[in-house]
């Protein structure tokens, strides 16, 4: 029988306070998800432990029976929860497990060194103290069998009322009813010399029972359920009279270590299965207080959870009868070692025996993947016990490409603490298969309909979510022990992609994912003061194109047990339950009944020895009863209940004892006094299923239909109740009296009723839509109804843009979205209306066989294409209205095509490399050319540029006439227009007209060829003979600056001649340019335009026109003035030349004219000197030649006047007038040859310094040349002026530059007129001649000088 007062398991042979010590986690099945048991959980309850499945051992079966802590166990799938290691009791209702066979021994009672004087209560025999110890003065011991009075309260601290806490036994105090992890444990009566099962763990918290300090429980990182211990202090070990020592050699143990396959699937999984450690330990009497023994376990074993507040603790071993601590525990986590230190209990008692019954766990930290022959071992004292197991982790949950796995990995709970209810963590593996997922989303939800008392919660205020990306190829720990240092924290990337819902859920949007992710959910518990809360959390992964996949985790409770010897007093108790099926036997699903009074009498004396009231769960417990016969009576039954039959079946622990029964206490608790009661009400209902084969009979593979409405009516047709079928298709009307009822089933949408009453099994056939049910002293669960899905079909297909208007769907043609499509029946009634999606698809669903009419609305701006083109009805157009027939299958052939009634205009701009005006195959397009479209009124409609292939296109054009203008690309010239007969290949020029008439016009082309580029330049040379012609021996002048200007006078280029005197300007278009040569320092411009263009000098500035060819005729020459004359005068003359230099004066030529005079010729004076050498004859005549110099001066007429004698000479010298031509003056040089006097004249040359002045004033010299030499001397003084003139006055002496040429397109130089004289030197020479002639006249004839005009 089950005692629901303390959730303890009571047998006729004894009692175990399993409510105190044992809670278990079960593998829950939630919906279609496989909820793997994560890690263990304990909600702040005393010394409770959590494990995956509760252990059962046949050898301990008779000793104790434990009951689960889960008060709401009837709301969970107990088939999944209660999977024991050996047997499963069908009558277990709340995670009940049988443990151990305990044999009763009447001998070897404990011998106490000091007897304890009781104050009140019944007397109980106890053992005497060890023989070598003196008795206490208060002892009444007479011998080993001396009786001693011990009060019930001393023997067992709590009474019945004190056991209101699940775990803790406290004094009667309402404020102590809540769970407190630091209160004392319930004591048990176990013989010290005959403990076989030791099914209870008694934890000494060394604290006053009134201290409230709820335990914080934390789960390990591993998914394996691990032992959890409540918060407590290690019991202080009193110093012994002798030095403490290791007494492993004085400890003997009988130990079993068994791998428990909780779900019996022959697969050992750390997350679900566990190890059962049971040991009976005998302590040698030589052991003293302070001595210790050890329990060592392998690194593959996890003894308890990693609660940071409990890490150092493990349960002490106590005497369950009096609560005394036998040994205190200390855990060395680094070395997997538990050290138990004995208290003075071993000094006062002999033959101490202890029992350990632990569920310990496989450490997934050291077993990261599936592995065979994993060894587990535990060494108690000096005895090692081993076992092995093949570890096989479950695969991830996979559906198509979606995959997921999860586990609880940590939890801390504070039951009853509103401010800090605790927290828990769940680790989720997302896409561990590393598939490529589209629109992947993870939903985490702390809810499941089967677990309404779930205390998990998820919301943005209390939940923290971390997301880690797993490297490709990385192997995740199957035990969910995650090393985040090896992963990439991507939490920040997803903060804005986490959405919290109102139903304790969060959705993480991963988008497109092709790697695995680890999601760690850290959140707080909801506040609870429940003694049996549950935690369930689901995780669901969805992605586009794949079925979603779910997993989840649920937590329950268990506890490990240890115990030692105690006083022999016992308990009576068990359970009052509602026997819903009235069979007198406790069964799963039947609930306890509270507030029933239970009274116990000594059957021999009829004395009342105890009384209790059943708790809400129906349990009760009456403690402190010695061996004897007792009468148990139940009273105060709830109104309307009747007593179920008693003594049904062969199991006295599960049957009903009736209202009064006599039971016996004999050496152990008797937990068999139960009472079953029931309400005389009945149920009616059964099942609604999908009859897939339509045979009217429920077959094994046919499933229920959920959500079907079922109505219950009385015989008169009045509606009594309405229910809907559950997820399995079940329905039930409860609390019904005997009578006739009418049941009506509503046909679920999309289904058709199956055939009725097929076959002879009324529990398997279908009763149809309406049936009658009779209740007559029993439930009627035979009313079923079957349905099969009404066949439905789809009709639809595609609306597309038929760009080529051929009425057929081509692969490049796209759908048209938003087109309205209407479905009508044969009578023209509208059934459905839809619109095409973004791809042009549409579909009408849920249609039955029949003929339908489909109408397409022509989209705006489109025209229907031709209908029925081709033979493939799947790709042709059915027009805007068509008929579709459905006959036992979908019809996906109804299409409609449309096109836009607009056209395109354009074609091509190409580089016409051969300039023939026709597109040739090897000629390519020109990109980036601007093309403008105008209407007939010259209004710009559109502008485009040609693409990389030279193509252009104007789209969406109506019929009409258009003007197209092409902009000439930079560096190109339009080619010839309309060459050839092919309008698609020729060039339409820069402007053309295009006509659109119901078709595209793609014939408007324009060709261009690259505009030719030309070069300009030639040569600057040293004209050593000053003839203005390039001779083969004359060399180029380097570094002469040459500047190029465009027609606007803007500088477009500057260069310098190279070492050969060459220069060049490249990349020039046809056009007008100006070339300016910068005169080199110290050089004089040579004469220009003396010969053909490519050999002559063109002067300092040249205008040139380039037309379709290069021009390499632009040359210029310079020479260096000769300064070899002894006469400084010639220098002064050369000064005048230097003046002319600035304008590249041809004066130098005129100077060369006066070869007769060595004076003014700066360059050819040396010639005049040589001339003077050649002439020895009539100087006077030759002087007249010097007059002829005046001829070189255009003033020569006046000179000839001054020379009456030599007029004829001067006339002949008039040839020297040609000196003004600057070339013919060389003839006058020969004149000077006749002037051999010029030696003496050369003196006069020094006088003729005045000539240098006369340079500045070519006619002042004509004034009385013979005025006097002194005058001319003064002139020579003024010569110094001419010296200054040489550089600064050149402009004054030559107002127009001596040589400025303009070239026509043949580059022929034209002379420009001068306002001054080009032959200053020649004038000077003439002046000298005139002066000498005048002087001669004065001396010989006394004549005045002639005035030159």
Curated annotation (Swiss-Prot):
Chain spans, region Ligand binding A region: 36-568
Comp. bias regions, Basic and acidic residues: 130-145, 174-183
Region annotation (Disordered) ranges: 54-185, 856-883, 972-992, 1081-1325
UniProt xrefs under Pfam families: Big_8, Gram_pos_anchor, SdrD_B, SdrG_C_C, YSIRK_signal
GO biological process, one term: cell adhesion
The CNA-B domain, residue ranges: 569-680, 681-791, 792-901, 902-1012, 1013-1123
Positions of post-translational Pentaglycyl murein peptidoglycan amidated threonine modification: 1315
InterPro entries registered for this protein in UniProt: Adhesin_Fg-bd_dom_2, Adhesion_dom_sf, Fibrogen-bd_dom1, Ig-like_fold, LPXTG_anchor, Sdr_B, SDR_Ig, YSIRK_signal_dom
Subcellular localization(s) per the UniProt record: Secreted, Cell wall
Matches recorded under PROSITE patterns: GRAM_POS_ANCHORING
UniProt propeptide residues: 1316-1349
GO cellular component: extracellular region
Motif annotated as YSIRK-G/S signaling motif, chain positions: 23-34
Gene induction: Less protein is secreted in a secG mutant (at protein level).
Assembly information from the UniProt record: Interacts with host DSG1; this interaction increases S.aureus adherence to keratinocytes.
Protein name according to UniProt: Serine-aspartate repeat-containing protein D
Native source organism of the sequence: Staphylococcus aureus (strain NCTC 8325 / PS 47)
């Amino acid at each position: 029988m089950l005692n629901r007062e303390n959730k303890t398991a009571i047998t006729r042979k004894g009692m175990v306070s399993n409510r105190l010590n044992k809670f278990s986690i079960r593998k829950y099945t939630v919906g279609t998800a496989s909820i793997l048991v994560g890690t263990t959980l304990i909600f702040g309850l005393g010394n409770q432990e959590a494990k995956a499945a509760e252990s059962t051992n046949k050898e301990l079966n008779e000793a104790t029976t434990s009951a689960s802590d889960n008060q709401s166990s009837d709301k969970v799938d107990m088939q999944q929860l209660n999977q024991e290691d050996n047997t499963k009791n069908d009558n277990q209702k709340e995670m009940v497990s049988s443990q151990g066979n305990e044999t009763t021994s009447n001998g070897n009672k404990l011998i106490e060194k000091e007897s304890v004087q009781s104050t009140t209560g019944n007397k109980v025999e106890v053992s005497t103290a060890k023989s070598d110890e003196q008795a206490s003065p208060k002892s009444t011991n007479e011998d080993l069998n001396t009786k001693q009075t011990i009060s019930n309260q001393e023997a067992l601290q709590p009474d019945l009322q004190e056991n209101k806490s699940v775990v803790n036994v406290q004094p009667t105090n309402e404020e102590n009813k809540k769970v407190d992890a630091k209160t004392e444990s319930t004591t048990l009566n176990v013989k010290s010399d005959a403990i076989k099962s030791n099914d209870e763990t008694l934890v000494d918290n060394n604290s006053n029972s009134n201290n409230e300090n709820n335990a914080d429980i934390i789960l390990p990182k591993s998914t394996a359920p691990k032992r959890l211990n409540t918060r407590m202090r290690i019991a202080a070990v009193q110093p012994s009279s002798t030095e403490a020592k290791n007494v492993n050699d004085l400890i003997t143990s009988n130990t079993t270590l068994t791998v428990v396959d909780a779900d019996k699937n022959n697969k050992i999984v750390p997350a679900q299965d566990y190890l059962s450690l049971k040991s009976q330990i005998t302590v040698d009497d030589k052991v003293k207080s302070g001595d210790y023994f050890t329990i060592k376990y392998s690194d593959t074993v996890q003894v308890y959870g990693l609660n940071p507040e409990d890490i150092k603790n493990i349960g002490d071993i106590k005497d369950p009868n009096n609560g005394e601590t036998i040994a205190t525990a200390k855990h060395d986590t680094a070395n997997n070692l538990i050290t138990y230190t004995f208290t003075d209990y071993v000094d006062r008692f002999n033959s101490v025996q202890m029992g350990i019954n632990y569920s310990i766990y496989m450490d997934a930290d050291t077993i990261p993947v599936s592995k065979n022959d994993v060894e587990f071992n535990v060494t108690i004292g000096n005895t090692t016990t081993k076992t092995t197991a093949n570890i096989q982790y479950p695969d991830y949950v996979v559906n198509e490409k979606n995959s997921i796995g999860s586990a609880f990995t940590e939890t801390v709970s504070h039951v009853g603490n509103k401010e800090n209810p605790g927290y828990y963590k769940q680790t989720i593996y997302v896409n561990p298969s590393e598939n490529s997922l589209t629109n992947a989303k993870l939903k985490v939800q702390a809810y499941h309909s089967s677990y309404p008392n779930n205390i998990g919660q998820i919301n943005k205020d209390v939940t923290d979510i971390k997301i880690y990306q797993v490297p490709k190829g990385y192997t995740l720990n199957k035990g969910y022990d995650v090393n985040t240092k090896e992963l990439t924290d991507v939490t920040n990337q997803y903060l804005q992609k986490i959405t919290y819902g109102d139903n304790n859920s969060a959705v993480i949007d991963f988008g497109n994912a092709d790697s695995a992710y680890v999601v760690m959910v850290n959140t707080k518990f909801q506040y609870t003061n429940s003694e049996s809360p549950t935690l369930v959390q689901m995780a669901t992964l969805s992605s586009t194109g794949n079925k979603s996949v779910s997993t989840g985790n649920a937590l329950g409770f268990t506890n490990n047990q240890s115990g030692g010897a105690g006083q022999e007093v016992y308990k009576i108790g068990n359970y009052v339950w509602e026997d819903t099926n009235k069979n007198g036997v406790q069964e799963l699903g039947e609930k306890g009944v509270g507030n029933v009074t239970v009274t116990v009498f000594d059957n021999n004396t009829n004395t009342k020895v105890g009384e209790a009231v059943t708790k809400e769960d129906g349990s009760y417990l009456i403690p402190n009863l010695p061996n004897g016969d007792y009468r148990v009576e139940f009273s105060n039954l709830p109104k309307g209940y009747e007593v179920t039959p008693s003594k049904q079946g062969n199991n006295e622990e599960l049957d009903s004892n009736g209202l009064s029964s006599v039971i016996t206490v004999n050496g152990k608790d008797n937990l068999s006094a139960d009472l079953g009661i029931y309400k005389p009400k009945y149920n009616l209902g059964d099942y609604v299923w999908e009859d897939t084969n339509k045979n009217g009979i429920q077959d094994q593979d046919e499933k229920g239909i959920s959500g079907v409405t079922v109505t219950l009516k009385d015989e008169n047709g009045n509606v009594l109740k309405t229910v809907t079928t559950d997820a399995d298709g079940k329905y039930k009307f409860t609390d019904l009296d005997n009578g006739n009822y009418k049941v009506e089933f509503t046909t679920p949408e999309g289904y058709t009723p199956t055939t009725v009453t097929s076959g002879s099994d009324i529990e398997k056939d279908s009763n149809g839509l309406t049936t009658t049910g009779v209740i007559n002293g029993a439930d009627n669960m035979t009313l079923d109804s079957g349905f099969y899905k009404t066949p439905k079909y789809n009709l639809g297909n595609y609306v597309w843009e038929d760009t080529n208007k051929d009425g057929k769907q081509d692969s490049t043609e796209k759908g048209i979205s938003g087109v309205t499509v209407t479905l009508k029946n044969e009578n023209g009634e509208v059934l459905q209306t839809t619109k095409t999606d973004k791809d042009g698809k549409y579909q009408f669903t849920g249609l039955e066989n029949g003929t339908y009419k489909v109408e397409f609305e022509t989209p705006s701006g489109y025209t229907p294409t031709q209908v029925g083109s081709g033979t493939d009805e799947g790709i042709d157009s059915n027009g805007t209205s068509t008929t579709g027939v459905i006959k036992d299958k979908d019809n996906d052939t109804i299409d409609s095509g449309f096109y836009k009634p607009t056209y395109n205009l354009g074609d091509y701009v190409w580089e016409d490399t051969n300039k023939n005006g026709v597109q040739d195959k090897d000629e390519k397009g020109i990109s980036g050319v601007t093309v403008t479209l105008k209407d007939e009124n010259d209004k710009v409609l559109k502008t485009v540029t040609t693409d990389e292939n030279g193509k252009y296109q104007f789209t969406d054009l109506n019929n009409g006439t258009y003007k197209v203008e092409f902009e000439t690309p930079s560096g190109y010239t339009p080619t010839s227009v309309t060459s050839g007969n092919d309008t698609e290949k020729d060039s339409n020029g820069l402007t053309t007209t295009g006509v659109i008439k119901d078709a595209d016009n793609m014939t408007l082309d324009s060709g261009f060829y690259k505009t030719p580029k030309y070069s300009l330049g030639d040569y600057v040379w040293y004209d050593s003979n000053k003839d203005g012609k390039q001779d083969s021996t004359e060399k180029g002048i380097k570094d002469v600056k040459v500047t190029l200007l465009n027609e606007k006078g803007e500088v477009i280029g500057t260069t310098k001649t190279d070492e050969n005197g060459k220069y060049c300007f490249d990349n020039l278009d046809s056009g007008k340019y100006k070339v300016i040569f910068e005169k080199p320092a110290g050089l004089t411009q040579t004469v220009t335009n003396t010969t053909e263009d490519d050999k002559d000098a063109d002067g300092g500035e040249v205008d040139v026109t380039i037309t379709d060819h290069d021009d390499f005729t632009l040359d210029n020459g310079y020479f260096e003035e000769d300064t070899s004359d002894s006469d400084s005068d010639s220098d002064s003359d050369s000064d005048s030349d230097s003046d002319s230099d600035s304008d590249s004066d041809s004066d130098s030529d005129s100077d060369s004219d006066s070869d007769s005079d060595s004076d003014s010729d700066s360059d050819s004076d040396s010639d005049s000197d040589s001339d003077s050498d050649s002439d020895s004859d009539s100087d006077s005549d030759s002087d007249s030649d010097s007059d002829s110099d005046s001829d070189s001066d255009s003033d020569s007429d006046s000179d000839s006047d001054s020379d009456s004698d030599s007029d004829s000479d001067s006339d002949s010298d008039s040839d020297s007038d040609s000196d003004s031509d600057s070339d013919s003056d060389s003839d006058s040089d020969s004149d000077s040859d006749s002037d051999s006097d010029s030696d003496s004249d050369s003196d006069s040359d020094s006088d003729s310094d005045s000539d240098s002045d006369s340079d500045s004033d070519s006619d002042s010299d004509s004034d009385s040349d013979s005025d006097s030499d002194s005058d001319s001397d003064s002139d020579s003084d003024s010569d110094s002026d001419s010296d200054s003139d040489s550089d600064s006055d050149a402009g004054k002496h030559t107002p127009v530059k001596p040589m400025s040429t303009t070239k026509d397109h043949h580059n022929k130089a034209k002379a420009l007129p001068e306002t001054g004289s080009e032959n200053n030197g020649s004038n000077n020479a003439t002046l000298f001649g005139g002066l000498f002639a005048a002087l001669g006249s004065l001396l010989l004839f006394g004549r005045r000088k002639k005035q030159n005009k």
